[in-house]
């Protein structure tokens, strides 16, 4: 059987669970995604056929990288990382991701400075007890929460950067890919997390 028409969610579930490989999709979204930097087997992994131990091994291999090479990342690699991100699941299969690329070490440094300026302003506001308590009095406890939980660590991070050049935000990364979602999506925060 070939799935066509407007009723399909194009999620691929019917293909994944069919025991006889009897279903195909006409929709081009399920054609092979071409990658220039690596190859992969273009076959669905049948339910129950993926080794749990391999998933556990993958999850245990996860690490935060804070040691980056002092060279820019090829544009092709950044584009392919985004392609991989678009294969992530999303709430209601809406796939409303927004990928923003900061492509060079110089751009990352400029972006980091802008973020630092934002947090310096936020720290000044949260350190103003009249403003903080006034907002709390009118039912907005966000600034008080920020001051209690983040003020000191953000202050230290900003001082480290300004006085010693230590980048605790991007750790000297050569490029950054930020993933966001549209507010009107069914679960934008979760979708963005799954695509990273």
Q: What is each stretch, according to the model?
A:
Residues 53-56, 87-88, 164-167:
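Short beta-strand/turn micro-motifs at beta-sheet edges
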Residues 37-79:
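Specificity-determining recognition surfaces
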Residues 80-93, 97-99:
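Non-catalytic interaction/regulatory modules that flank or connect domains
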Residues 21, 31-33, 103-109:
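Terminal amphipathic helices with adjacent charged low-complexity linkers/tails
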Residues 62, 80-86, 175-196:
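Small-aliphatic-rich amphipathic alpha-helix that forms the alpha element of a beta-alpha
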Residues 1-2, 13-31:
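Iron-sulfur cluster-binding cysteine motifs and their immediate structural context
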Residues 101-187:
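Glycine/small-residue-rich phosphate/adenosyl-binding loop
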């Amino acid at each position: 059987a070939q799935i066509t028409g407007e009723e399909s969610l194009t999620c691929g579930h019917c293909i994944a669970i069919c025991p006889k490989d009897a279903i195909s999709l006409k929709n081009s979204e399920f054609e092979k995604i071409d990658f220039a930097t690596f190859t992969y087997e273009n076959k669905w992994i049948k339910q129950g056929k993926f080794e749990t131990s391999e998933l556990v091994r993958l999850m245990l291999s996860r690490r935060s990288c804070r040691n980056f090479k002092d060279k820019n990342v090829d544009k092709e690699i950044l584009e392919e990382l985004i392609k991989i991100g678009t294969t992530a699941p999303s709430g209601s299969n809406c796939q409303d991701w927004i990928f923003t690329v900061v492509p060079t070490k110089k751009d990352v440094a400029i972006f980091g400075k802008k973020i630092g300026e934002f947090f310096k302003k936020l720290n000044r506001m949260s350190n103003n007890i009249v403003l903080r308590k006034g907002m709390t009095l009118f039912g907005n406890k966000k600034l008080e929460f920020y001051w209690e939980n983040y003020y000191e660590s953000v202050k230290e991070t900003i001082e480290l950067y300004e006085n010693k050049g230590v980048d605790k935000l991007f750790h000297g990364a050569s490029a950054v890919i930020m993933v966001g979602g549209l507010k009107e999506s069914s679960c934008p925060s979760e979708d963005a997390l799954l695509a990273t």
